[in-house]
Design a protein with these regions (language model features):
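A glycine-rich phosphate-binding loop feature that marks nucleotide/adenosyl-phosphate handling sites
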Residues: 210-218, 353-357, 415-416, 440-447, ...
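Duplex nucleic acid-engaging cores and interfaces of nucleic-acid transaction enzymes
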Residues: 81-84, 95-105, 109-352, 356-460, ...
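Short, ordered loop/turn segments at secondary-structure junctions
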Residues: 69-71, 272, 355, 368-369, ...
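Single-stranded RNA-binding regions, centering on S1/OB-family and related RNA-binding modules
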Residues: 581-585, 589-753
Length: 753
């Protein structure tokens, strides 16, 4: 065994010298202490709160649970802060593991020095570690490696002491062998060795990378195959395109990447001559000032063009793509969150229409409780169906509206949507019906209709009817319906298929988890798809909960959840507070109060003279008394956590609120809008359907959504549309321009002078 400095500073750790493995666990503790400190400083959060948070998460707690039920331990950190802590700690853990691995790999080659070890230990980011490791990575044998094997390394070293080329030529004679037959071959081999040595220096790579990231220009041109592969000229904007990468927007980065991948564009990075000269002069400083300058420059040019720049360009393009992916995923996350948080239209009987041409419009009735009641088909497109079919469709429509007391008609926005909307608007007008309709984004409805969960819910119904049911339920409870569909099929992303799919999936899953746990779920009505996003519930357990309901009837109290197969004490702890039972035996089971805090709730109620039963029966009187109750004093006297008592107090004082109620209800319509009726300057209300980096797409009632470009959102400069617009938001806009031939409409929100 030997004593070695730990990777975290001055502490000493015991290491088995035969395996390079750290064998005393104390070093890992030191490493974590340093990580906690770094994260605390970066996020401006007390170090003990960072440590407490990570220990909870390491112990199996979920972010929603920690944020809501462990406020005293974390210092009342919210989900975003907890997520940031976790992300940074995971990065630093990976960094420390990579440092250990790199030290081991270099040591196995017998090339590890104290100086090299210290450089690795002091590295702050992964890229720094990789730059240090670069010369030691296993790679294909190069010409320089062959030159070294032929004994030319000493000659390469002479380039730093010789004064001119003649001196080098004389020295090179001593290196002539069977494998190196001439002076020229010897000099060429030595120059290759120097070029490779230059390319492997971490400080050069780091500086050149910085210059490329800050100053390089990306250039795209149409490939030779462009005319053949891009008939619709989708990439026309990039056929002769250049831009500084520092200013390049994420959607343009991803568009260029896709065009290159499809062999439509050729792409490369270019440096200004002044930046190239700056790099060459930086490297030239390592050589002496003498008559070999021209030779040194030749070596530097070879090292840059053949070895450094191709590698750095790949790294920079990857960094550029990663930046674009992060921004694209962030846009998707915001859009998905706002889509899931759309206000539900509760207790409304819905007639759902999934438009179609030849096969007709599929119709489903969904009652106000979300239950499917009946289905039929309307043939209503005048250009395709005969007058009798259209008349029959009108009669069926009116009969269903009367029979089920329909409140809202929900129309999918896909094929034949415009004709279906015209049909509905005309019937409402002709019959003076007190009825509204809305156009629903049906993206993903067909994916749902063919899914396993749809087959489980409606085994006896055709896939087309299931799609109509989804369109209807989406307005009654968007969250409950949309969680059944892969979020990538919902249609609110930007270049979503061009980003890292595992990162995208993880990010979107986190968004769904955040929203679902924020809203909570009724354990007696929620689908397994919704339940699977609740804290502590995996898909198998979610299905077991639904199965338990079928076999035993509704859950009567939260304790009963422990009877479900796969639910142990830890899982129960994580999920219980997020599952509610409105008609349960215990009124607290319909609140956000966690079962572990029921004793606090009962003690608090006792202080105002109420038992749980009395509180349930005399709710208004109990809440009147609670208004004047000093819960802070109560927490101090009983040594209860102040944050927990505050949450318990507020839950007893008010009904459980649905955060979605704070969002605008969808825009209901009774008449149709036609592009021919639009005039520049006309004011309208619209619903934001998608927010992207260059603006937002707004549903103003036409077949296609209109574009509100980022430059038209405000008179003030807007750098990010998502800061002022959200999916589902209802906004007032004016018509800026109309292209009737292409069916395109431009909007503005700018104030008029």
């Amino acid at each position: 065994y030997e004593i070695m400095p730990s990777l975290v500073g001055s502490e000493m750790c015991i290491r088995d010298s035969t395996s390079s493995m750290i064998i005393n666990k104390k070093c890992k503790g030191y490493a974590m202490e340093k990580i906690y400190k770094i994260v605390a400083e970066e996020l401006k959060i007390p170090v003990d709160k960072v440590e407490n948070t990570i220990k909870l998460l390491d112990d199996g707690a979920t972010i929603p649970f920690v944020a809501r039920y462990r406020k005293e331990i974390t210092g009342n950190l919210d989900e975003v802060q907890i997520g940031d802590i976790l992300q940074k700690v995971e990065y630093l853990r990976n960094l420390e593991e990579r440092k250990e691995e790199v030290i081991r790999l270099i040591e196995e080659q017998g090339k590890l020095t104290d100086e090299l070890r210290n450089s690795i230990v002091e590295a702050k980011i992964l890229q720094e570690v990789e730059d240090i490791y670069f010369p030691y990575r296993k790679k294909k044998k190069t010409k320089a490696d062959i030159a070294k094997e032929r004994g030319l390394e000493p000659l390469a070293e002479k380039f730093y002491t010789a004064n001119n080329l003649e001196e080098i030529q004389n020295l090179a004679k001593d290196f002539i062998t069977e494998e190196v037959p001439t002076v020229e071959d010897a000099i060429e081999g030595a120059m290759l060795i120097i070029a490779q040595n230059i390319s492997e220096k971490a400080e050069y790579r780091e500086r050149i990378r910085e210059i490329y990231l800050k100053s390089s220009i990306i250039e795209a041109k149409a490939s030779k195959k462009a005319a053949e592969l891009d008939e619709k000229k989708v990439y026309n904007d990039y056929y002769e395109y250049s831009e500084k990468i520092e200013k390049m927007a994420s959607h343009r980065i991803l568009a260029v990447n896709r065009g290159e991948k499809e062999d439509i564009l050729t792409v490369h990075l270019r440096l200004e001559d002044s930046d190239r000269e700056k790099i060459e002069n930086m490297i030239l400083k390592e050589f002496p000032k003498n008559d070999l300058v021209a030779t040194y420059k030749e070596i530097i040019k070879d090292s840059l063009d053949r070895l450094i720049i191709p590698s750095i360009e790949r790294e920079v393009r990857n960094a550029l793509t990663e930046r674009a992916e992060i921004e694209s995923i962030a846009v998707f996350k915001d859009n998905l969150k706002n889509l899931l948080l759309q206000a539900p239209l509760k207790e409304k009987n819905v007639l759902a229409l999934d438009p179609g041409y030849r096969t007709g419009c599929k119709v489903a009735v969904i009652d106000k409780y979300g239950f499917y009641r009946e289905n039929t088909v309307f043939f209503l497109v005048e250009a395709m169906h005969n007058p009798k079919q259209i008349e029959d469709a009108k009669k069926k429509f009116l009969a269903l509206v009367k029979k089920y007391e329909i409140d809202i008609v929900s129309i999918g926005n896909g094929t034949a949507s415009r004709e279906t909307e015209t049909f509905v608007a005309n019937i409402i007008k002709e019959n003076k019906l007190n009825l509204k309709y809305l156009i629903v984004n049906e993206a993903g409805a067909s994916v749902y209709s063919a899914s396993k969960i749809a087959a489980e819910e409606f085994p006896d119904l055709d896939v087309t009817v299931r799609g109509a049911i989804s369109i209807g339920r989406r307005i009654q409870d968007p969250l409950a319906e949309l969680v059944k569909i892969d979020p990538k099929s919902i249609g609110v992303g930007m270049y979503q298929h061009d980003v890292n799919q595992s990162k995208l999936d993880e990010s979107l899953d986190n968004v769904i988890s955040h929203v679902v746990n924020n809203v909570g779920a009724n354990i007696n009505t929620a689908s397994w798809a919704l339940l699977s996003h609740i804290s502590g519930i995996k898909k198998t357990v979610a299905k077991n909960i639904v199965e338990y309901r079928k076999e035993n009837g509704n859950f009567k109290n939260r304790k009963e959840i422990l009877k479900v197969k796969g639910v142990g004490p830890k899982a129960y702890e994580q999920m219980a507070g997020f599952l509610v039972i409105p008609e349960g035996e215990n009124i607290l089971d319909n609140t956000v109060i966690h079962p572990e805090s029921y004793a606090i709730a009962e003690a608090l109620l006792e202080k105002i003279g109420f038992s749980l039963e009395k509180y349930n029966n005399e709710l208004n009187e109990a809440r009147e008394r609670l208004k004047s109750f000093d819960y802070k004093k109560f927490a101090e006297e009983n040594n209860f956590g102040a944050e927990t008592v505050k949450d318990v107090y507020e839950a007893l004082l008010k009904d459980r609120r649905d955060p979605r109620d704070d969002f605008e209800k969808p825009l209901l319509k009774s008449d149709i809008l036609n592009i021919d009726n639009l005039e520049v300057g006309m004011e309208l209300e619209g619903t934001v359907r998608n927010v992207v980096k260059f603006g937002a797409f707004v549903d103003i009632g036409l077949k296609n959504d209109a574009l509100l470009h980022i430059s038209e959102i405000s008179n003030k400069y807007i750098d990010d549309p998502s800061k002022v617009l959200a999916v589902g938001q209802i906004i007032k806009v004016r018509i800026k321009d109309v292209d009737k031939d292409r069916g395109r409409v431009g909007l503005t929100k700018k104030e008029q002078n």
